[in-house]
A protein has these predicted regions:
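Conserved Class I S-adenosyl-L-methionine
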Residues: 23-24, 49-70, 84
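Conserved beta-strand signature within the Rossmann-like core of class I S-adenosyl-L-methionine
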Residues: 33-40
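A short glycine-rich, Lys/Arg-flanked "PGG" loop and its adjoining helix->strand segment in the class I
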Residues: 18-32, 60
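Glycine/threonine-rich flexible loop motifs
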Residues: 10-18
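SAM/dcSAM-binding transferase cores
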Residues: 78-133
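Short "lid" loop at the C-terminus of a central beta-strand within the Rossmann-like core
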Residues: 9-10, 41-45, 74-75
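Conserved class I S-adenosyl-L-methionine
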Residues: 14, 40-56
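Short SAM/SAH-binding signature in class I
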Residues: 1-6
Length: 133
């Protein structure tokens, strides 16, 4: 199973989707092989990076596997945005089966196995923010 949280910013109506209680509820309803993906703001601006660090800290205190990955979206502030990946058992790099993916023969304009691995390699300043929270 999969929970995708493509929420608004953690201010106002979207605030409830960034709470420890919400993440704990996600953990409770996911199977052992389930995955939670949440939008985690941008590391570039102080206000956004503060929320990114808070969300990651809450999630990593609940889920045994908690990672952050990045993508670039020119229409978002700074263009550099992050997502969280959380699971009880599945690691987004160690447990992915690229042979199975390649056997599907799906042609994409953006996604490929190298990008999948690379998006989890964070810039030093982002990794330091997450490590120091």
């Amino acid at each position: 199973d999969l929970i995708l949280v493509d929420s608004t910013d953690p201010i106002g109506p979207g605030e409830g989707l960034f709470t420890t209680e919400f993440y704990q509820n996600c953990f409770n309803i996911l199977s052992d092989n389930g995955i939670l993906v949440n939008q985690s703001e941008s590391p570039y601006y102080d206000q956004f990076s503060h929320e990114m660090k808070r969300a990651h800290k809450k999630i990593k205190n609940i889920f045994p596997i908690s990672k952050v990955y990045q993508f670039h979206m020119p229409t978002y502030p700074s263009g550099h945005w992050l997502f969280g990946f959380a699971s009880k058992k599945l690691d987004p790099i160690k447990d992915v089966d690229f042979d199975k993916w390649n056997a599907l023969g799906i042609k994409t304009k953006y996604y490929n196995p190298q990008l999948h691995v690379g998006c989890f390699a964070l810039p030093s300043y982002v990794q330091e923010m997450l490590d120091n929270e």
